[in-house]
């Protein structure tokens, strides 16, 4: 459960560190806006942070910037090989600029947000494996 013991729904930004995730590696180095909407989104990580393949982090460690109270302000982790992603924020709810609570004025003409890359990367990975 979230540390707040309630359902959290908010728009905030994530940092995408260097990573080997099939879906998120091409977004490394970005800060992107995204929706959070869950009551049970807390990552409880008993080991030290270096033991996990962290692929997305909330920009802040404390509430409300880390709305669920996840250890190490983790928003997403991945398997060592990069194939399996576990992510609490909803990137599928931030694909189009009109879905975002805030989007840069100079990018308002975009048809899609950078989050679409995650799904394009997954599709390309599957297509490559099907050859």
Model-flagged regions — what are they?
Residues 1-131:
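Amide-donor transfer/coupling interface in amidating biosynthetic enzymes
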């Amino acid at each position: 459960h979230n540390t707040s013991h309630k359902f959290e729904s908010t728009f905030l930004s994530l940092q995408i560190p260097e990573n080997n995730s099939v879906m998120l590696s091409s977004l490394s180095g970005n800060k992107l806006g995204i929706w959070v909407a869950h009551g049970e989104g807390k990552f409880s990580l008993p080991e030290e942070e270096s033991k996990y393949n962290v692929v997305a982090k909330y920009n802040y460690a404390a509430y409300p910037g880390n709305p669920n109270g996840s250890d190490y302000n983790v928003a997403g982790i991945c398997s060592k090989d990069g194939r399996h992603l576990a992510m609490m924020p909803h990137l599928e709810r931030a694909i189009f600029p009109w879905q975002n609570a805030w989007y840069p004025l100079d990018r308002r003409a975009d048809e899609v947000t950078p989050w679409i890359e995650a799904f394009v990367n997954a599709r390309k990975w599957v297509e490559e494996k099907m050859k």
